């Protein structure tokens, strides 16, 4: 991460969820959600089992992909999806 101001309103050490595919298999992050309860999820967009979940800090996510800072303004209950790393993000409200 560069010496830019931290883009999220949450602290850099805020716990968030990712998947083993992003963390251990270097898959790109293609699904991001800012859940109603305040939790962030940064996932590969694939199918997941409970054992695929990993907990990391927001700062760690930015170290994996600094472009995630572009989604720091997602409101509670919003998600963003992309088809690939070169696609535009499509932001929508999550279904309750």
Where are these regions (language model features)?
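Acidic, proline/glycine-rich low-complexity IDRs
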Residues: 1-96
